[in-house]
């Protein structure tokens, strides 16, 4: 199994961000890069950063099943369950730099709902650099 170094992972992510040819799943690729970077950078926090499988197209039957199980539309893509001096968790919505990559109304509702509690930090990250900056800032002085 090939274990990627941070430098190699970062170089690959930068190269993908600079491609002119559109990717079929740019938000997916961005999220994969971010999760891989986090795993390499913070191995002691393994299992604390996880994805919420809210995206994708589903049949009406599958959507109804998921809703019955408690799935809530608009929940952020990633959740970091680690408190810092101010918040109980970091909620991360992944978007790309594309002009049409915007939060849906349900995502905006979720953001307003959780931030109004004052207990959680919610951020939107459009690049690996955004993600790295937000995570480092959030975890600053607590590890």
Enumerate the predicted regions with their spans:
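Catalytic phosphate/metal-binding cores of nucleic-acid and nucleotide-processing enzymes, i.e., regions
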Residues: 1-143
């Amino acid at each position: 199994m090939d274990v990627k170094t941070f430098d190699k992972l970062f170089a690959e992510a930068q190269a993908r961000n600079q491609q002119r040819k559109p990717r079929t799943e740019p938000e997916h690729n961005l999220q994969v890069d971010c999760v891989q970077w986090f795993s390499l950078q913070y191995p002691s926090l393994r299992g604390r950063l996880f994805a919420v499988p809210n995206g994708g197209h589903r049949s009406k039957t599958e959507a109804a099943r998921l809703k019955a199980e408690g799935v809530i539309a608009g929940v952020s893509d990633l959740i970091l369950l680690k408190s810092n001096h101010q918040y109980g968790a970091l909620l991360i919505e992944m978007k790309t730099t594309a002009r049409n990559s915007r939060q849906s109304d349900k995502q905006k509702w979720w953001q307003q709902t959780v931030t109004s509690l004052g207990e959680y930090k919610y951020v939107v990250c459009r690049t690996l650099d955004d993600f790295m900056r937000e995570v480092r800032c959030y975890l600053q002085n607590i590890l």
